[in-house]
């Protein structure tokens, strides 16, 4: 039970609540895209004050948050910043997405295109990429690799496919406890791993991807 004198405000500009964690499953045809999207008004608690605005500046000495439509004071502040996608960070990626079998699961609409591509697969080369941190959900790029491999296996096309996971990190996952099991999963599906490979450009029409490879000291 909340104390009657407790006032909670949530600064959130979005009209929709997006369950982004499920977009990997949408990309694998295992989840409905529409089930990942709800009006923000339906998930916002009724007992809070919803400030539909962007937080722009913190003034901790003044216990104040500046937003796009005014200033708000507080006694306690909990900051939950997100990440903004930057498809322009890879040359040619923005222009290539959604066609010529160039996909991403970091968008609900694009995740449905991932599934359209997977459904039509009969083999070939599949590249799964993970950029440098920070990114949303470091496991997402490899989860779709496993799901795609399993889909190909069920279709009897895994042996006709060349799957490769190219990761900007020097290891498959940042938590050592999981590195062994994840590498075993890759081995079971025949997924090749290439670490310290960062995607820098895409040409969807010619189906070419260029990566920058670095050593443990960051030299390219």
State the predicted function of each range:
Residues 39, 113, 147, 181-185:
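Amphipathic alpha-helical segments that form well-ordered structural scaffolds
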Residues 1-49, 132-176:
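Beta1-alpha1 glycine-rich phosphate/pyrophosphate-binding loop at the start
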Residues 49-143, 150-156:
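FAD-binding core/adjacent interface of flavoenzyme oxidoreductases
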Residues 2-4, 66-71, 217-218:
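Short amphipathic alpha-helices and their capping/turn segments at secondary-structure boundaries
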């Amino acid at each position: 039970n909340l104390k009657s004198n407790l006032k909670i405000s949530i600064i959130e500009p979005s009209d929709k609540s997006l369950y982004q964690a499920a977009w990997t499953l949408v990309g694998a045809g295992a989840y409905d895209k529409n089930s990942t999207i709800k009006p923000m008004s339906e998930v916002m608690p009724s007992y809070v004050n919803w400030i539909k605005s962007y937080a722009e500046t913190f003034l901790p000495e003044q216990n104040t948050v500046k937003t796009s439509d005014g200033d708000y004071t507080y006694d306690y502040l909990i900051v939950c910043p997100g990440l903004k996608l930057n498809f322009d960070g890879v040359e040619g990626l923005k222009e290539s997405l959604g066609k010529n079998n160039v996909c991403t699961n970091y968008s609900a609409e694009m995740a449905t295109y991932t599934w359209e591509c997977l459904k039509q697969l009969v083999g070939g080369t599949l590249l799964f990429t993970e950029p440098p941190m920070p990114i949303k959900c470091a496991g997402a790029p490899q989860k779709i690799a496993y799901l795609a491999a399993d889909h190909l296996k069920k279709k009897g096309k895994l042996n006709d496919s060349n799957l490769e996971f190219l990761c900007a990190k020097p290891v498959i996952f940042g938590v050592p406890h999981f590195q062994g099991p994840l590498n075993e999963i890759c081995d079971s599906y025949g997924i090749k791993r290439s670490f310290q490979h960062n995607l820098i450009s895409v040409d969807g029409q010619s189906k070419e991807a260029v990566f920058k490879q670095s050593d443990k000291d960051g030299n390219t």
